[in-house]
Amino acid sequence: MTQVAKKILVTCALPYANGSIHLGHMLEHIQADVWVRYQRMRGHQVNFICADDAHGTPIMLKAQQLGITPEQMIGEMSQEHQTDFAGFNISYDNYHSTHSEENRELSELIYTRLKENGFIKNRTISQLYDPEKGMFLPDRFVKGTCPKCKSPDQYGDNCEVCGATYSPTELIEPKSVVSGATPVMRDSEHFFFDLPSFSEMLQAWTRSGALQEQVANKMQEWFESGLQQWDISRDAPYFGFEIPNAPGKFFYVWLDAPIGYMGSFKNLCNKRGDLTSFDDYWKKDSDAELYHFIGKDIVYFHSLFWPAMLEGSGFRKPTNLFVHGYVTVNGAKMSKSRGTFIKASTWLNHFDADSLRYYYTAKLSSRIDDIDLNLEDFVQRVNADIVNKVVNLASRNAGFINKRFDGVLAAELADPALYKTFTDAAAVIGEAWESREFGKAIREIMALADMANRYVDEQAPWVVAKQEGRDADLQAICSMGINLFRVLMTYLKPVLPTLSERVEAFLNTELSWDAIAQPLLGHKVNAFKALYNRIDMKQVDALVEASKEEVKAAAAPVTGPLADDPIQETITFDDFAKVDLRVALIENAEFVEGSDKLLRLTLDLGGEKRNVFSGIRSAYPDPQALIGRHTVMVANLAPRKMRFGISEGMVMAAGPGGKDIFLLSPDDGAKPGQQVK
């Protein structure tokens, strides 16, 4: 061994248990798996674990929609997720669930320690409540305009545009995602984690070099704006763990989700009958290394809350966070309508796992850059690199060795200096794998592949094979080519596990990092079989079409506008009779200064004037065109005080929003003030 063996615990972010794994998820799991496989090749003791994130309101509501229990739903989803990851050869040592006894015990332990140490605060807060569904709304079930950057359609806990976090009550014009209703405020006692108490520790950790520069810079912005206490409780109804000694209060999903890393590892230790490793890895002075691979959208939780929770409860902090960017397809956000929102299982019906593993790896670096899966470039790169450069190197030499020399390689290297060039590259390539500069590693390997193919081209074994008395030269040349191929595949083994197994079967030896210093001399290889097939754009077309069909099938029970806006609960005739709908004449329509959504309408009800603010500006950029039109309004709606004045009713419109809003009009002959029945 050239280095001291390390104890390493590696995690990926926990997939949420209410949906299928897609190619966006796979970037992270492939990145982590490549790194883990490299560490194992170098002799390190690696535990690679993950779990499903199985709690929260979304899971509770989806299970209700499906007519099953949350436990049944997350159980089925866990099996699907594990099947997908296995299909991509993600080499987890354990895959668990946050809905487990290990996670419950650890969540309660950490909470209790934080409380005993004075880091849990209780206070009554005003919280958004859905009056139609009779439930408090979790952060992710409220949408509105970000209070910081003013981006629309943002969730209630953090902005996906500027990265800011905030309270749902700070959202501008909030709406319930569950019912579409405007939430009302209600008081509730909540429990808060005192994050500001850890500001000094977190800043020191940030400056320690444990984080990527981009992450550290972002954290500095958060420190400068001031850390806030973190709400860690949610009110019933909620699917999760009830807080000890607090009936009707549950741990917020983001409290027990990262603890799921610990829960999954403890479950693994229990399976092994190993009662000491959990403490060895998680105790405060542990010499083990702990790495979290995560996406840039959850940096805030992992870089602030998680290390602070661990510090406050007497556990060790992560050695590092490895953060990656998002996945785009063909230069754009993944789209269901375009067929580029591709599930992992769909991919495996059309391509092998190694192809995507290679393409992602070739594009990854240690930076937090987005990765574009350009499907045409994908086909070209896989064919050019894996097929033409690497596999072809074996095929053009193996035939001669099998047919002319019974599979036995030469006893000496034809070009020891060239072989040394290949083995000397192990230092640079190994450092690239270690530092997650995956793209650099691939470039170095492909440069060697080009060198190997030039050697074969120059030696021309197909010519030598036809010349009398040159059998020894032919064996030496082809053996050299196969030995160079072996070194290349050893370097690529973390990326291409399926191809590597086939290569090991052909070479009749394991691809080992430490073994490349010794070439295969006088060694017998097995009969050569096709190692990898070319791919083409027809497969891409079929993949995209299949993804489109899956979307259609999922939407089949309900089509059209009903798919996005289902019919609400049945009401009685008496309920409907309370709503007074009237025909109104639009006398005037104008922009509202200070608002990019509202128009101010002056309506004539046949003897009574009404002032109404309506959010239809995006569909009617010329308000003057509305003057003189008849429409329908809710005439007995209580006046609503707004920033721009008092709105005395509501006009009726259809459509999903944006430019697709259509003001309703009565048939010809209807007069202002007439009731709509």
Swiss-Prot record:
Domain of life according to the entry: Bacteria
Amino-acid positions noted as binding Zn(2+) in the UniProt annotation, renumbered to this chain: 146, 149, 159, 162
tRNA-binding domain segment(s): 575-677
Cofactor(s) essential for the protein: Zn(2+)
EC number: 6.1.1.10
Comment on bound cofactor: Binds 1 zinc ion per subunit.
Keyword rRNA-binding applies: no
Motif extent ('KMSKS' region): 333-337
Catalytic activity from the UniProt record: tRNA(Met) + L-methionine + ATP = L-methionyl-tRNA(Met) + AMP + diphosphate
GO biological process: methionyl-tRNA aminoacylation
Gene3D superfamilies for the chain: HUPs, Isoleucyl-tRNA Synthetase, Domain 1, Methionyl-tRNA synthetase, Zn-domain, Nucleic acid-binding proteins
Any one of the GO CC terms: cytosol
Localization terms from the record: Cytoplasm
Keywords, alphabetical: Aminoacyl-tRNA synthetase, ATP-binding, Cytoplasm, Ligase, Metal-binding, Nucleotide-binding, Protein biosynthesis, RNA-binding, tRNA-binding, Zinc
Pfam (any one): tRNA-synt_1g
Binding site for ATP: 336
EC top class named in words: ligase
PROSITE patterns linked to this entry: AA_TRNA_LIGASE_I, TRBD
InterPro entries per UniProt: aa-tRNA-synth_I_CS, Anticodon_Met, Met-tRNA-synth_bsu_C, Met-tRNA_ligase_1, Met-tRNA_synth, Methionyl/Leucyl_tRNA_Synth, MetRS_core, MetRS_Zn
Segments carrying motif 'HIGH' region: 15-25
The UniProt record lists the keyword Cytoplasm: yes
Subunit structure: Homodimer.
Entry similarity comment: Belongs to the class-I aminoacyl-tRNA synthetase family. MetG type 1 subfamily.
HAMAP family: Met_tRNA_synth_type1
General function of this protein: Is required not only for elongation of protein synthesis but also for the initiation of all mRNA translation through initiator tRNA(fMet) aminoacylation.
Protein name as annotated: Methionine--tRNA ligase
